[in-house]
Amino acid sequence: MTPNEFFSIKYHILAKAELKAYIDKLADYLSQQSYLYHTLDKPIISDSDYDKLFRLLQDLVNDNPQFKPINSVLDRVGGEVLAGFETIKHKKKMTSLANVFSLEELRDFYDKIEYDIELECEPKMDGLAISIFYKNGKFDYAVTRGDGIQGEKVSENVKTIRNVPLKLNTSNPPEELEVRGEIILDKQSFLSLNEYMQTHENKTFANPRNAAAGSIRMLDSKVVAKRPLKLYSYGIGYFSKDFVYPETQFELMQLLQSFGFTISDNMFLAKNFSEVEEYHHKMSHQRADLAYDIDGLVFKVNNIKLQDTIGYTARGPKWAIAYKFPAEEVESEVLNVEFQVGRTGAITPVARLKPVAVGGVIVSNATLHNINEIKRKDIRVGDRVIVRRAGDVIPEVVKSLPQYRKSDAQMVEMPTNCPVCDSKIENVNDQAIYRCTGGWHCQAQTTERLKHFVSRKAMDIDKLGAKLIEQLVAANLIKYPADIYKLNFEQLTGLERMAAKSSQNVLDSITKSKEPSLARFIFAIGIKDIGEVSSDALANHFGSLESFRDAKFEELIEINDIGEIMANNIVSFWHDSLNIKIVEEFLAIGIKIQNPVKVEHAYNESFTGKTVVITGSFENYGRTELTQLLKSIGAKVTSSVSKKTDMVICGDNAGSKLTKAQELGVEVILEDNLKDLL
């Protein structure tokens, strides 16, 4: 049918069954036109006709909601605002590719396969990895990568992406099919979005990848629907037995395209390594001119049977490799050096730069790490410098170019007083890190401490974000953790951009956090160098806050994961009268800390009572899953290897922990032997 034929039908006089058939036909027609426009870039009707037909479908469904088609173009406009995302397990683990950083390493990968092979070559999109599940050809749900074992269900947001098929374009779909791809925002759309964000929300995204990832994790799919996200498919994950798998990777990509998915138009089939080199050379030179950001290239063995023969490691397939482009370096000028204050008072110098594009991002700030680095690199205000940025790494100043130095270039000196609160800055034990001594009296430290206090692994007050903390501190509404629990509705609604619903959500989130575990509370109060694992060890050892407060240095250093520096920091924390006052005030307002419950563990000869460290990645276990399993049989799982460690459980790609275990003579257990011991 044509648009005019749809318009000519007198749908208002149709019988119910005929009207439903008309609505279904119109929805299918619009889905096909959307596919032609967004995926193939070959529209056959005008934008005006599409908009009119879309509006007609909306009106018909609004008047006849019982006839709303499942997985139609109407789902692309977004729906209700969600309270949060459900976490679900992947049917097939979402692994990662191993990386190489030079043509020599790429050649090694090619030679190790020991076969005369073809490689399917494609750009490595710099976006958000996603899995989309289809049942009998219809969109079922979508999940982010997460930790590879489980991810967040973001179906409503992914449905709004115009080139994501809501129905597979095939008359014989498999019962189940999981399609994997990368959600991106092209360069021009990113610039347009940032212009809008700057004008309407006074903030911008750092790069297209962050914009895509941030958009998919929004709770309001109607906002996501307005953002021009795009999906590029690169393969499949889980599939049912009735799926006929093609013989080659290249044919698989063609099949996905026939199903309605967008694939890269820069794919290439290399018949030998010379053609791989040619592809690498071509894409390296074309990278800057592509419509979207790429951070490398992906090479996959083309023959599917050969892929199965070559196999997998726990981390990912051995038949594919990711070539990562080298870090991009450009010249800029140091306009000024400012000093930032962190949660523990650490003073970090930051270079304010003449804005320059590095790795697809406009960079105007770069870390200088510490004053010793500044002196070592001889960086001065006014210098021309080399700035480097790779992936999501914070931009850094690599070196100065003294040959271009002006006579008025100024040396950088560490201030003697805090730039925020004017307290003394001290350098303890002649270390590289200088610290503000203001503590809770320093607004910068207060703000960062409160951000840490409400964070997910601490008190988990998820609706109280970093920007809102800054607003509350600036408005003198909070200064100490207990102040958070004294906030009221009127105070919150009086802040900029805080409507009634948002304010109530914050208050509900605060109330929900009033019964933290002892481990969470210890982590939340922010004792220097005490992280999540150490907090857990302290909570399990002492059993209550009262016992922890009375801890002696000698007892602390006997605990796994607690060294002398950490023990000193704990003792110093409880010797500070302000810290004690803050904790007591916190308890006085009715916070109920949940002490750990002593659990009788199942006895296991190999692990009960043993101190265990886990390192590397595992084929049959997630890290969290393995940790919980070991704890359930009485093992103490710690994060670092020491003389107190009884054994190290080692997966693929183990690093320094394995080396240290071997140096100390600690028993090493490989995954192959682990199952028998468990």
UniProtKB/Swiss-Prot annotation:
Keywords: DNA damage, DNA repair, DNA replication, Ligase, Magnesium, Manganese, Metal-binding, NAD, Zinc. Its EC number is 6.5.1.2. Gene3D superfamilies: 5' to 3' exonuclease, C-terminal subdomain, 6.20.10.30, BRCT domain, DNA ligase/mRNA capping enzyme, Helix hairpin bin, Nucleic acid-binding proteins. Residues 602-678 form the BRCT domain. Its cofactor is Mg(2+); Mn(2+). It comes from the Bacteria. It holds the Pfam family DNA_ligase_aden. One of its GO terms (molecular function) is DNA binding. GO terms for cellular component: cytosol. NAD(+) binds at residues 47-51, 96-97, 122, 145, 182, 300, 324. The active site is at residue 124. SMART domains: BRCT, HhH1, LIGANc. Zn(2+) binds at residues 418, 421, 436, 442. It catalyses: NAD(+) + (deoxyribonucleotide)n-3'-hydroxyl + 5'-phospho-(deoxyribonucleotide)m = (deoxyribonucleotide)n+m + AMP + beta-nicotinamide D-nucleotide. PROSITE patterns: BRCT, DNA_LIGASE_N2. Signal peptide: none annotated. One of its GO terms (biological process) is DNA repair. DNA ligase that catalyzes the formation of phosphodiester linkages between 5'-phosphoryl and 3'-hydroxyl groups in double-stranded DNA using NAD as a coenzyme and as the energy source for the reaction. It is essential for DNA replication and repair of damaged DNA. Belongs to the NAD-dependent DNA ligase family. LigA subfamily. This is DNA ligase. It comes from Francisella tularensis subsp. tularensis (strain SCHU S4 / Schu 4). The lineage of its organism: Bacteria, Pseudomonadati, Pseudomonadota, Gammaproteobacteria, Thiotrichales.
